[in-house]
Design a protein with these regions (language model features):
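Extended hydrophobic leader/signal-anchor segments used for secretion and membrane insertion
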Residues: 1-452
Length: 452
């Protein structure tokens, strides 16, 4: 036990922990102190004490496993279908990229950020102790096309009454609303900063707004399509990395408009293709569907006797979508036509000006904790004028395999290295919420690999 403890201390890299070696020696050898003070060393303990002892041991053991080895993650949304399905429970390896030490070690066991049965309003962690980002040695690094679990970067600020929507999305929509109201009323338009301040104050008055540290932000799972130093480009729905078209996986989905002769497609056909009931969306006219389909399923449906046409639902180049990163009309991008955009790499320096500052605002101001201001088109970092910036962390570009039903980097930008949690390796349980009885359990997905 002592050797294992020393090896663990070397791995963690905090040699002050060697002061705990006498405790380990006493627990296993000398046994002078009753470290499990809640139970008697000799004689029979009450059954309640025995259960309490087992519970304490289980909580400590599972907590250590979650930090250093594996963590469970349940897929809540269809953003990775058909690679990973809603209801899949994943074993996420912490050693794949190296375990990340907690920022907030004082937390109620087995919770992410909220106490159970409180309606999402009571936080489960304390900020009395806050540790800086530290990642232990792992077996490798994040690679292109790895499936990765990470903390949601835009989840640093949350409106408790609207937790399913990003605070920054709420803020942008509020700015658009009050700007439109001024235009309709014929009032003089305000500056960008003034609209921001007004919208922010309205939101803080209307909602309960809180801050969450990195390790207490919601967990997401996506595919890492771009690593530090890569250039991402999307043209007509096709993804290019460094000028080369990226691999299209068999399980990757795109939304299609499927036209029929007025009759509906047999539900059994949808069931065979794995198209869930919630995805079977009829068009307004009722003469077709809008469906997320793999390329293979699209080819299958196109051969149905009552299908008269099928077309991928791609946006036009130049169609500006305000929700798409960097949320700047100067870059008329959308989820199907995006970039080129370079992914920041640790130690690299970029020139800053008013044409590109929106790409790096969150990095400089939030992720790397500087004070960023813009006054009269002059950029100030920590109170000093700045025309360049050197990145202190690596960044990644994450996208869902279900391209038209995924909130991912196309909408909120880069994922910092300190947000990376681990890599899913196995599906250990899969529950289909739309099925009944034993059919709810997808036995065919048990222990299915989830690496690629």
């Amino acid at each position: 036990a002592g050797v294992l403890y020393i090896l663990w201390v070397i791995w963690v890299g905090n040699y002050w922990l060697l002061l705990g070696l006498p405790i380990v020696f006493d627990i296993y050898v000398s046994k002078k102190v009753n470290w499990a003070f809640w139970k008697k060393r000799h004689g029979k303990n009450h059954v309640v004490v025995e259960w309490l002892d087992a519970l304490i041991f289980a909580v400590i053991a599972v907590s250590l496993i979650n930090i250093f080895l594996f963590q469970n993650y349940r897929i809540p949304t269809p953003s990775m279908e058909k690679t990973l399905l809603v209801g899949d429970h994943l074993a996420v390896s912490k050693v794949a990229y190296g375990p990340r030490m907690p920022n907030t070690p004082l937390v109620f066991p087995f919770t992410q950020h909220t106490m159970p049965f409180t309606g999402g309003r009571v936080k489960s962690w304390s900020d009395l102790i806050h540790w800086k980002y530290n990642r232990l040695k792992g077996f490798g690094h994040v690679k292109n096309n790895d499936i990765v679990v990470f903390n949601f970067p835009a989840g640093d600020t949350v409106c408790l009454e609207q937790q399913a929507v990003s605070y920054y999305e709420i803020l942008r929509e509020r700015i658009e609303t009050i700007t439109a109201e001024d235009i309709r009323a014929g009032r003089p338009l305000k500056g960008k900063d003034e609209y921001y301040s007004v919208a922010r104050q309205m939101i803080w008055n209307e909602y309960t707004v809180i801050y969450r540290p990195v390790d207490r932000r919601d967990n997401y799972v996506k595919r890492c399509v771009g690593i530090p130093g890569d250039t991402v480009l999307i043209k007509g729905g096709k993804l290019f990395i460094n000028g080369h078209e990226n691999t299209e996986y068999e399980t990757q989905q795109t939304s299609y408009y499927v036209r029929t002769n007025g009759t509906r497609i047999n539900p059994k056909a949808f069931e065979r293709m794995g198209v869930s009931k919630s995805d079977q969306s009829l068009t307004i006219s009722g003469s077709g569907y809008r469906l997320p389909l793999t390329r293979k399923n699209a080819e299958t449906i196109s051969g149905f006797a009552n299908v008269t046409g099928i077309e991928a639902d791609y946006r036009r180049p130049g169609e500006y979508i305000a929700a798409v990163f960097p949320h700047d009309p100067a870059y008329r991008w959308n989820e199907d036509n995006f970039g080129p955009l370079w992914i920041p790499k640790k130690g690299t320096t970029v020139k800053l000006d008013m044409t590109n500052i929106n790409f790096y605002t969150s990095i400089i101001d939030i992720y790397e904790e500087n004070d960023l201001e813009i006054r009269d088109t002059v950029i100030y970092i920590n109170g000093k004028p700045a025309d360049s910036y050197t990145f202190r962390m690596d960044y990644y570009w994450m996208m869902g395999d279900n391209r038209h039903d995924s909130a991912d980097s196309r909408f909120w930008g880069f994922v910092p290295e300190d947000h990376i949690i681990g890599r899913p390796v196995r599906v250990w349980l899969s529950i289909d919420k739309e099925a009944q009885g034993l059919k709810k359990i997808r036995f065919n997905r048990f222990f299915k690999g989830a690496k690629r």
